[in-house]
Each structure stands twice: as C-alpha cells, then as structure tokens.
Amino acid sequence: MKFLEKLKQAGNRNKSLLCVGLDPDPKLMPVGMSALEFNREIIEATAPFVCGYKINLAFYEALGKQGWEILSETCEFIPRELITIADAKRGDIGNTSKAYARAILDELDCDGVTVSPYLGYDSLEPFIEYQDKGIFILCLTSNQGSTDFQMLKTEYLGQKRFLYEVVADKASLWNRYENIGLVVGATQQEELKKLRLIYPKLPFLIPGIGAQGGDLKATIENGTNPNGELAIICASRGILYARSGSEFAQGAAEAAEQMRDAINHYRKRF
C-alpha cells in the first residue's frame, strides 16, 4: 500500500492527524520500567486516538546494544493499520545511504523516514526509490538554530530564495513517485502557511507542538490542505509524560484524546 493511502486510511479510522513520538527517556519514565514496556503501554493506551507514531532513533541508539532490539520490537508492536515513521534524519552518499535505507525501511519495515537534504539528491535517492514509503525531507525545522542555514538567501532559478524554499521546490520536483513530504516546524507559522499554499499535495510532518511552543490552532489552519488533511501533527513529551508514576499510560491516553479532539475542533472549518 502506498504511504499516502495508508496515512489517509489511518487518519479516517481514528479521525486523527495526531502522531505520537515514542521517545523513551529514562529520566522521565517510571522508575524501574524498561523502555520496551513503557512503549508498549503507551501504544496500547494511545492507539485509538492517533494516525501513527514517530520513533526518534536517537533515544534507542542511546540505550546501547539493546537499543536496536527494543526499537525493532517497538515497531512490531505498533498496529499495522497505523503509520510508523522513523525520525532518523539520515543523509549520506552511496552505499552508506543505501544501508541506512535498508535498515529502516526493510529491516524495521517503517512506513516512513525523515532525511536530510544537505548532501543533495544522490543521498536521498536510495530512500526515494522505496516507492511505497513516505520520505520526509527536512525543510524548515522547529529549533531556534534553524535560521542559521535554512533562512539564508541563495540564487535559485534567477531569483533570490530562502534555502528552505529551494529545498521545498527540489522535493516537489523529485516527487515522481508521490512519496515525498516535508518536515516543517510548528514554530514557523508564516513559512508553514506559504509552503502549504504552494504545495497543497505534499504531506507535512509537523513537529514543535507543545514543549517547543508551536500553536495548535495556527498549525491546523496553516498546515493542512484545503480538505483539512495531509498534516501529521507530532507530539511527544506532552503526551508521554502527561502523568508520572503508575498512571502514566492513562495520562497519555487522556492527553492524546484531548489533542486529537482539539485538532478536530480546529479542522471543523474544512
């Protein structure tokens, strides 16, 4: 099944654009609980309210030799009708990029992955060739340092353009399999609105809601397409750690349901 088709089915099934980030932090998890058990309980509690899960690979790499096993088992535990996106931000050349793509899209069998465009098309091609997978290119990120490079102006097709605009245009040109999307932070509302108007058919993976200060209402208004779709709204800490101790899973379920419902409230205009 093509990524966009699966995304639409998952969104319709749970009436949700919400994507929960599975970022297990030992400092915030219940004392004595393994990352795998934490993830399982979070998934069981939140699955009715989401379109999918975004798995930040760094949190698993930080767990050492057991991290890959936990990552793999976490991916297997996610219901197959929901999407799984590996937040890997990979970008390299030649066989290295091919190996990254195999690891994430074959071995883990994730539905999507985030990639960095800094090394150019040949670094992304091994991912893009997985025609049924969603390839999300970092375009305009939610962190403060994003302006260091992404907001620089450069000559492009005879005009001065911001670098993030060049990335978005290249992504659109490379989208021959209709499997490419953009990562655009919820902290960049003016630019988010501009990008959505120019690229109504591209899915946007939108981090930055909650702890990073992104406004949910503005994100829905600016980030969805004319049908109120094609925006994947990411939230991690505000859901995973909504409550502490033994009630963490119930807290996550309530937080996910509340955010799902808030998103749908703002989607009513569509």
UniProtKB/Swiss-Prot annotation:
Domain of life the protein comes from: Bacteria
Keywords for the protein's UniProt record, in alphabetical order: Decarboxylase, Lyase, Pyrimidine biosynthesis
GO MF, one example: orotidine-5'-phosphate decarboxylase activity
Reaction(s) this enzyme catalyzes, per UniProt: orotidine 5'-phosphate + H(+) = UMP + CO2
GO BP term, pick one: 'de novo' pyrimidine nucleobase biosynthetic process
UniProt-listed PANTHER family: OROTIDINE 5'-PHOSPHATE DECARBOXYLASE (PTHR43375:SF1)
Protein name: Orotidine 5'-phosphate decarboxylase
Organism, as annotated: Dehalococcoides mccartyi (strain ATCC BAA-2100 / JCM 16839 / KCTC 5957 / BAV1)
